[in-house]
Curated annotation (Swiss-Prot):
Protein name per the record: O-phospho-L-seryl-tRNA:Cys-tRNA synthase
HAMAP family referenced in this protein's UniProt entry, alphabetically: Sep_Cys_tRNA_synth (MF_01675)
Pfam families per record: SepSecS
Organism lineage: Archaea, Methanobacteriati, Methanobacteriota, Methanomada group, Methanococci
Cystine bridges: none
UniProt organism field: Methanococcus maripaludis (strain C5 / ATCC BAA-1333)
Length: 380
């Protein structure tokens, strides 16, 4: 068998080294320098298992067991387990506490992985209403309406799911209202915090949450794939049920999950997470500044106003107008940004785009704003 492996050698990526990355799916997952150092110690397969005591969450060296206890405090929950991502966390909950055919009531802004998890767990769903253009806010009262409708139809409800911050518009849902509805109706409540935990303060107990699904690589300065599932002790026996064959292994975790660099990078970044969520107001100031400075150019921010999250979605008719007369067509914006050391915006996009300045310095934010102003003013 002959296979040419030359294309797999010397694979490189220079986006983070040479450019300012504006991609909202990546801004929260950028590793600080101190976290990168740990990669050299744990890049071998199963290196975290040097002193394994039978299960990942019980490993003492490195102190994964203590880290998970501390993470529970950080999130305001009782018990935390590492997973491969928020999607796996959601599936673990659905597959353990719901019965086949049960309904999951979820918001209209839910991520596609919520639906995939529902389908994989052989469940049904009922989607709640959201506000109209241009805000698209989750309507908490719609949860009560959908629950009543399902109950009247004699449908079994297994779970209430809410996307804390959606990836399309960056809207922050009213968790407390939905949590009160779930509690009053007597249903378990799962909060998808893929875009929030690690970026902004989260306290599950204050929010009436039973489960938190978090993403290490999306919002907690960790390499991927890595996530967390935090639960209330009330659901420990159901969600963390162990195998009858190997009694130490938890079924929903398939024994062990993130057993390598991802979980170690998350641990190394933990101190940074604790500090950065305290500065969330400063992140919002930077985000709102971007919106206020760019809208006069002909950009229109979609989603709730003022911004309560770092994800910014712009409709950009002005870019469309420029693309019609520029010989580069829809690629001009990407190329002009790249020429100025800015990346993370999709190539060929002119009708709308998403961006984030999370974690950038004020000087960098000003540079981003001024660069976009220059591009528009020179080419319009």
């Amino acid at each position: 068998m002959e296979i040419n492996t030359d294309k797999y050698k010397n694979i490189t990526r220079n986006l983070e080294r040479e450019m300012i990355n504006l991609n909202p799916i990546q801004r929260g997952g950028i590793l600080p320098t101190e976290s990168k150092k740990i990669i050299y110690e744990y890049w071998d397969g199963y290196s975290v298992c040097d002193y394994c005591s039978g299960r990942l969450d019980r490993i003492e060296t490195p102190p994964i067991n203590e880290f998970l206890e501390d993470m529970s405090k950080f999130l305001g929950m009782d018990i935390t387990r590492p997973t491969h991502g928020a999607r796996e966390s959601k599936y673990a909950v659905m597959n353990s506490i719901c019965k086949e055919g049960d309904y999951v009531v979820l918001d209209g802004n839910a991520h596609y992985t919520s639906y995939v998890a529902i389908e994989r767990a052989k469940l049904n769903y009922e989607k709640t209403d959201i506000g109209e253009y241009p805000t698209f806010r989750v309507i908490p009262e719609s949860y009560a309406e959908k629950i009543d409708m399902l109950e009247d139809s004699k449908k079994n409800i297994g779970l209430i799911l809410l996307t804390h911050v959606d990836g399309n518009y960056g809207n922050v849902a009213d968790v407390e209202k939905v949590g009160k509805i779930a509690k009053s109706k007597g249903y378990p409540f799962l909060l998808n915090c893929a875009y929030s935990a690690g970026r902004m303060p989260i306290d599950g107990k204050k929010l009436n949450v039973d489960f938190i699904a978090a993403s290490g690589h999306k919002s907690m300065a960790a390499s991927g794939p890595c996530g967390l599932l935090s639960i209330n002790k009330k659901y420990e026996d159901e969600v963390l049920e162990t195998s009858k064959v190997n009694v130490v292994k938890e079924l929903q975790m398939l024994g062990c999950t993130s057993r390598g660099i991802p979980i170690l990078s998350l641990m190394a970044s933990f101190e940074r997470l604790i500090e950065r969520v305290k500065k969330w107001d400063l992140e919002l100031e930077k985000t709102r500044k971007v919106v206020n400075e760019l809208e006069p150019l002909g950009f229109k921010q979609i989603g709730e106003k003022p911004r309560n999250h770092d994800i910014i979605r712009f409709e950009t008719p002005i870019l469309d107008e420029i693309a019609e007369k520029d010989k580069r067509r829809g690629f001009f914006f990407y190329e002009e940004l790249k020429r100025r050391g800015l990346g993370g915006i999709r190539r060929g996009v002119t009708k709308e785009f998403k961006m984030s300045v999370y974690g950038l310095t004020n000087t960098q934010v000003d540079y981003v704003i001024n660069s976009m102003k220059t591009i528009i003013n020179e080419l319009r």
